[in-house]
């Protein structure tokens, strides 16, 4: 089974992202920063106090179209205004999506907010403190004759940086509660995503207490599209390192400002 995690950057590099999706071979594809604008396709522009970025209007639909033999699961963390190319405003949902190959029976789904609660930003997106969710899916791997629980996370963004804060500690505790509630005894468990944390965060101690081992550590998980010197963001943890056949932090192709994390079990 191949599990891939990627912060998709709202599809800002869709011309590169689309062929990568076609060829990545993921049985479970966990994406963060997924957009959904009802009734609209093509491109939009996202703006907050810090950034102005191109985004796909409906990255969720774009990926579903390219993965017709996967179940596409989506949970929205918040919503706010974006503009199309004619500068007309639309309401865009923003969140997480997990795509599961149709030959893997989905036997459990659960989502929870790890920070805040769903919010409609009426006039402008805030540049920090936005709600964050996690999405768990439990599947049966027939070939390996085991159950696998995969938890997809997009962690809290704080304009002050990625150091631990009380909000991030509370996020870790909520995440741990979700993991414990979603998996069952004996499940191989994978927790992955853009954590927005430093490698020495106490979050990893909280997850280690659940028997989860981080495979990323202090490695660089950003691409050349990210200009800042601090290169830590994405992580992937497993409950049984012995079940890992291969793990890669993919340096090419570049399809986002984050590198994809590729796990073969």
Where are these regions (language model features)?
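Active-site beta-strand/loop signature of hydrolases that rely on acidic residues for catalysis
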Residues: 3-7, 20-51, 99, 137, ...
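Metal-dependent phosphoester-hydrolase catalytic domains
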Residues: 104, 177-190, 195-265
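Short, flexible loop segments at the rims of nucleotide/cofactor-binding pockets, characterized by
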Residues: 5-10, 126, 164-169, 193
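Structured beta-strand-rich core segments of catalytic domains in phosphoester-bond hydrolases
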Residues: 10, 35-147, 249-252
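Metal-dependent phosphoester/phosphodiester hydrolase catalytic core
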Residues: 121-122, 131, 142-169
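Charged helix-capping and loop-helix junction motifs
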Residues: 52-57, 166-174
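Short, acidic/polar
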Residues: 11-21
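Active-site environment of divalent metal-dependent phosphoester hydrolases
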Residues: 11-13, 36-39, 80-82, 157-161, ...
């Amino acid at each position: 089974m191949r599990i891939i995690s990627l912060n998709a950057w709202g599809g800002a590099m869709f011309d590169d992202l689309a062929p990568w999706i076609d060829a990545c071979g993921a049985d479970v594809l966990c994406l963060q920063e997924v957009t959904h604008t009802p009734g609209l396709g093509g491109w939009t522009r996202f703006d907050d106090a810090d950034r102005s970025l191109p985004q796909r209007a409906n990255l969720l639909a774009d990926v579903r179209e390219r993965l017709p033999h996967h179940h596409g699961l989506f949970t929205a963390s918040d919503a706010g205004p974006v503009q199309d190319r004619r500068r007309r405003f639309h309401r865009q949902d923003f969140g997480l999506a997990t795509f599961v190959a149709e030959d893997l029976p989905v036997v459990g789904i659960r989502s929870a907010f790890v920070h805040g609660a769903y919010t409609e930003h009426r006039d402008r997106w805030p540049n920090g403190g936005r709600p964050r969710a996690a999405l768990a899916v439990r599947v049966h791997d027939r070939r390996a004759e085991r159950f696998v629980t995969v938890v997809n996370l997009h962690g809290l963004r704080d304009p002050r940086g990625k150091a631990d804060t009380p909000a991030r500690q509370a996020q870790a505790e909520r995440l741990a509660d979700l993991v414990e509630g979603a998996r069952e005894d004996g499940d191989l468990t994978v927790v992955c995503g853009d954590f927005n944390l430093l490698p020495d965060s106490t979050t990893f101690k909280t997850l280690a207490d659940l028997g989860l081992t981080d495979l990323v550590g202090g490695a660089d998980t950003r691409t050349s599209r990210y200009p800042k010197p601090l290169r830590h963001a994405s992580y992937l943890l497993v409950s049984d390192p012995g079940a890992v056949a291969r793990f890669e932090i993919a340096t090419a192709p570049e399809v986002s400002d984050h590198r994809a994390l590729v796990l073969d079990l």
